[in-house]
């Protein structure tokens, strides 16, 4: 379990995170939603160990995050950042291999090839990363994360995937494929934390939704309880857009319905 308690982070006089507390459990897909500037990526960076907050604490299985070395953290969790651009002319295989090396694999190239296949990129091994489309680059970076945590559980402890807008550059087919792979990782006992702007995908795939606004968590729980007209109006400033799919009781957001 990853637990954050009373996280506060201030930069250039601005409070980016304000007394944020979350519990992330293995076996679950946790999704953060909220408007631009809500603090979503900042919270993920604090939870993954990339940034340190001024106040509060983060623990992995009851051990304080600062107690882990970078090598230990690299073997416990993998991060797909929002920005996937690189300045150097690596091949797709070389980039994904970096994830396998960080994990300490004894066969990093083989592990990288398997991860590329899981991301639907078999045959891309020798393609130049900088010549790929934005969506293909996104999937290569997703494969790198999969190579870094190839198994949901290692030595009895859950591994974690941190995915910052993993569907941002993808077509609908690959959006669903990436999220299904993430869900499979969670189903195997791993922990997934993703940031999504597509509320319909968030509603479908999240076991726990975390709604952020103004650096605070304003709601959390199953999508059926958290995605409502009231929440959308308060957080995004539009109203009358949420419906329900009768068969599975999954909420869906239809922006056109605001014109009723």
Swiss-Prot record:
GO terms for molecular function: ATP binding; ATP hydrolysis activity. Keywords: ATP-binding, Cell inner membrane, Cell membrane, Membrane, Nucleotide-binding, Translocase, Transport. GO terms for cellular component: plasma membrane. It is a peripheral membrane protein. InterPro entries: AAA+_ATPase, ABC_transporter-like_ATP-bd, ABC_transporter-like_CS, P-loop_NTPase. Residues 2-239 form the ABC transporter domain. ATP binds at residues 34-41. It is found in: Cell inner membrane. Its main location: membrane. Signal peptide: none annotated. Its EC number is 7.6.2.-. The keyword Signal does not apply. The complex is composed of two ATP-binding proteins (HmuV), two transmembrane proteins (HmuU) and a solute-binding protein (HmuT). Part of the ABC transporter complex HmuTUV involved in hemin import. Responsible for energy coupling to the transport system. Belongs to the ABC transporter superfamily. Heme (hemin) importer (TC 3.A.1.14.5) family. This is Hemin import ATP-binding protein HmuV. The gene is hmuV.
């Amino acid at each position: 379990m990853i637990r954050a308690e009373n996280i506060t982070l201030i930069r250039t006089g601005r409070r980016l995170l304000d007394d944020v507390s979350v519990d992330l459990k293995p076996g679950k897909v946790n999704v953060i939603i909220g408007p631009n500037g809500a603090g979503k990526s900042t919270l993920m960076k604090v939870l993954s160990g990339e940034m340190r907050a001024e106040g509060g604490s983060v623990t992995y299985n009851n051990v304080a995050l600062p107690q882990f070395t970078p090598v230990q953290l690299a073997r416990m969790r993998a991060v797909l950042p929002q920005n996937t651009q690189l300045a150097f002319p690596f091949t797709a295989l070389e980039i994904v291999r970096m994830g396998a090396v960080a994990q300490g694999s004894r066969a990093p190239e083989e592990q990288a090839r398997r991860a590329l296949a899981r991301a639907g990129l078999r045959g891309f091994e020798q393609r130049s990363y900088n010549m790929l489309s934005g969506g293909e680059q996104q999937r290569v970076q997703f494969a790198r994360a999969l190579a870094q945590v190839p198994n949901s559980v290692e030595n009895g402890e859950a591994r974690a995937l941190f995915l910052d807008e993993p569907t941002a550059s993808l077509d609908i087919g690959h959006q669903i494929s990436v999220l299904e792979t993430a869900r499979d990782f969670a189903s195997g006992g791993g922990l997934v934390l993703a940031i999504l702007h597509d509320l319909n995908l968030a509603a479908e795939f999240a076991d726990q939704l975390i709604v952020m606004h103004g650096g605070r968590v304003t709601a959390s729980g199953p999508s059926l309880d958290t995605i409502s007209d009231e929440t959308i109006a308060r957080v995004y400033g539009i109203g009358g857009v949420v419906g329900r799919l009768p068969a599975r009781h999954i909420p869906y957001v239809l922006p056109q319905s605001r014109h009723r």
